[in-house]
């Protein structure tokens, strides 16, 4: 099994005065159907506690993710998951849709009475902050958003426990959505491929045409 993520990287933010850190990861960015989903877990850096068996969600079996989900929620100071639909991805573009999903999760954290001091975001690009725009053609979002400092780290989901835990929450919730949608459109095999562009998914798409849950603005065939 891979090396267990820790809170070592997160702990360095204590020296800058941060106590509550929000680890954030997304799931579904590369799918051709279904939502993009963002998970958040908040940890108290002044009282670091590790959580056994947590890994980046992609490295875990589905049964392990399901088992760990309630443990992650109990371990976190606060946690949340937000989604942006395929229609929103088509209308906004993927970066703004990620921001929309992340903002929805962020506002849930604030509504729970928790205000993180800093954010650790998986990847190299800050798609979460309201002022961040992918291009001149990507509209800046209206309304409230994440106003905490955002730090990005490539492969944070592999080494940082807060981000790996967030990836589990996002993956479990999105997979449940795709299994539910499979009941409406069983031909696409979403119970197995979770909306990703497998050969069988694309073959069904060519035969039946897109559903309302496909990202039709993408070159999905």
UniProtKB/Swiss-Prot annotation:
Binding annotation for a divalent metal cation: 25-26, 122
RNase H type-2 domain ranges (all copies): 19-221
Keyword NAD annotated: no
Entry note: cofactor: Manganese or magnesium. Binds 1 divalent metal ion per monomer in the absence of substrate. May bind a second metal ion after substrate binding.
Protein EC: 3.1.26.4
Key word Cytoplasm present: yes
Domain of life: Bacteria
Catalytic activity field: Endonucleolytic cleavage to 5'-phosphomonoester
Subcellular location per the Swiss-Prot or TrEMBL entry: Cytoplasm
SUPFAM superfamilies (alphabetical): Ribonuclease H-like
Xref: InterPro entries: RNase_HII, RNase_HII/HIII, RNase_HII/HIII_dom, RNaseH-like_sf, RNaseH_sf
An individual GO BP term: DNA replication, removal of RNA primer
MF term (GO), any: RNA-DNA hybrid ribonuclease activity
Record's GO cellular component terms: cytoplasm; ribonuclease H2 complex
Sorted UniProt keywords: Cytoplasm, Endonuclease, Hydrolase, Manganese, Metal-binding, Nuclease
Co-factor requirement: Mn(2+); Mg(2+)
Family: Belongs to the RNase HII family.
Chain's role: Endonuclease that specifically degrades the RNA of RNA-DNA hybrids.
Protein name: Ribonuclease HII
Species in which this protein is naturally found: Arthrobacter sp. (strain FB24)
Top-level taxonomy: Bacteria, Bacillati, Actinomycetota, Actinomycetes, Micrococcales
């Amino acid at each position: 099994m891979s090396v267990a993520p820790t809170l070592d990287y997160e702990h360095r933010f204590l020296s800058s005065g941060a106590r509550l850190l929000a680890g954030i990861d997304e799931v579904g960015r590369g799918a051709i159907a279904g939502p993009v989903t963002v998970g958040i877990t908040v940890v108290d850096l002044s009282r670091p506690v590790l959580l056994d068996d947590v890994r980046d969600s992609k490295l875990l079996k589905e049964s392990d993710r399901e088992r760990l989900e309630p443990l992650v929620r109990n371990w976190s100071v606060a946690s949340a998951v937000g989604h942006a639909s395929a229609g929103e991805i088509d209308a906004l573009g993927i970066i703004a849709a990620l921001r929309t999903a992340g903002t929805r999760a962020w506002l849930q954290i604030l509504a729970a009475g928790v205000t993180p001091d800093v954010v650790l975001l998986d990847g190299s690009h800050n798609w979460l902050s309201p002022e961040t725009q992918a291009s001149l053609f990507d509209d800046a979002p209206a309304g409230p958003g994440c106003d905490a400092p955002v730090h990005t780290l490539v492969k944070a989901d592999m080494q940082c426990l807060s981000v790996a835990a967030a990836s589990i929450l996002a993956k479990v919730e999105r997979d449940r959505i795709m299994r539910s949608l499979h009941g409406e459109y069983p031909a696409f095999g979403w119970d197995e491929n979770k909306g990703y562009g497998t050969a069988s998914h694309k073959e069904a798409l060519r035969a039946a045409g897109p559903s309302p849950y496909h990202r039709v603005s993408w070159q999905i065939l």
